[in-house]
Amino acid sequence: MGRTGHCVVFIDLHTLFGIGDRRPGRATQKIQPLELAPGVWQMGLITFMLLGSFMIAFTSNAVNLTDGLDGLAGGTLLIAAFAMMVLTWISASQRASYFLMVPYVPGSGELMVIAGAMAGACLGFLWFNVAPAQIFMGDTGSLAMGGLLATIAVCVRQEALLVLIGGVFYLEALSVIMQVGWFKFTRIRFGEGRRILLCAPAHHHFQQAGWKETQVVGRFYLIAITLAIVALVSLKLR
């Protein structure tokens, strides 16, 4: 995301938490719906804003990098959105959040509607996006959907589980970072750039290794489903 994107993320968080609004009761009214249950550790507001901004920006770009094969980004987003819908329901329920020892976030049940709408949109989109694709998500769709997914996770205080739920996206992004970083390092160190993968992002590496496009997409779906299940099951295993 460019400078404008980061400004938008900061403004959203600024508005969400009422920073700078010193009218009596105003800031409290904005923060109160997102406060955690007593006894739950909270990081400082500035740290939280920096972490939240980073998570939203990084996830947005990670989804954008994943959108390289027909049906890949749409399907993995569908899985992640469904898992996030479950998390928002748990966070909104005082009994469920206490039982599973996750932060209780009053009012977060409204986000379940957004996560459900996101999953439904991905499902309808995927019908026309599977190979051979008739429509494409593009940068506008992938950046927005990735940012929305991360925003929901930040609002319900599940940034850590987002790393599992969106594991495919982060692996794709890390593959690009590692490939570019290693290439630049070896070019400076040895005078010749070297690569870790055959091609980046990771889905193109497997294509170069001989996998068919449908094989890559299908297996990434399986990985995404597995990670989503592990993330949800881990709530009970704490």
Ranges and model annotations:
Residues 26:
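Charge-lined substrate channels and their catalytic hotspots, especially those that engage the 3′ end
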